[in-house]
Amino acid sequence: MQNDTLQKYLNEVSLKETLNAEEEMSLSSLDNDAARTKLVESNLKLVIYIAKQYKSSANDLQDLISEGNCGLMLAAERYDFSKGNKFSTFAAFYIKSKIREFIYKKNRSISIPLGAVNKYF
């Protein structure tokens, strides 16, 4: 059952079109929920790509994608096109950060401050 759900999600995301830099800039300048939603939806493939890099027997791909999506939404809220970065470059940091935080919290039996862990990863 879980694989069917994941496969349907992957198929649905594969149909989403990615935006070019011009479209990203115009959407981010609008600063409204509809524009942010379109920005997020057009970058869901990036989340899947990054999540697959962190997949292991201990980490379920669905969980990694879910956490990565949280990072993507956070990036959409904080993105400022005037800084000159592409959204995907900016978002990759937040996606990886959320995925790493999830893996750390899930797989550690001893609690180490997340800031200390981030220094080494």
State where each predicted segment sits.
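Alpha-helical promoter-recognition and RNA polymerase-docking modules of transcription initiation factors
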Residues: Q2-I112, A116-F121
